């Protein structure tokens, strides 16, 4: 199923369009790889999608189980490797504490988050670490 279209704009930039919604965004190569770093790089999007996916799965889990889910923020840290240049590690620092869940609920929510499709796709190739607070 086609989901998007990507066009090269020149100067190491691309335009990405989501076909269903029409939403668009630009990517730019990072400064450490010949770009200007003026927008998300493709690997930034990869790393950020992990946090976004985990939050989405938490939301789905909470909706299905009648659990209030109001607050969540995450910091995304991406560590690159060389030879070949690739994402070696993604660290997600996810703040869930403002939801006031008991320990049992928090454990179940975290377990659900770790089943997100992005993590399941990446986990054998990229070191993934979560820090839940």
Where do the language-model regions lie?
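Extended beta-strand/beta-hairpin segments
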Residues: 1-48, 59-133
């Amino acid at each position: 199923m086609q989901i998007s279209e990507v066009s090269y704009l020149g100067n190491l930039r691309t335009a990405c369009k989501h076909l269903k919604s029409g939403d668009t965004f630009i990517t730019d190569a990072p400064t450490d790889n010949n770009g200007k770093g003026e927008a998300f790089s493709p690997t930034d999007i990869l790393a950020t999608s992990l946090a976004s996916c985990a939050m989405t799965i938490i939301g789905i889990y909470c909706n299905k189980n009648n659990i209030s889910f109001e607050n969540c923020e995450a910091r995304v840290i991406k560590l690159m490797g060389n030879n070949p240049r690739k994402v070696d590690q993604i660290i997600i620092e996810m703040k869930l504490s403002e939801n006031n869940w008991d320990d049992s609920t928090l454990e179940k929510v975290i377990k659900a988050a770790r089943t997100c499709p992005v993590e399941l796709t990446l986990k054998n190739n990229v070191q993934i670490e979560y820090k839940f607070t």
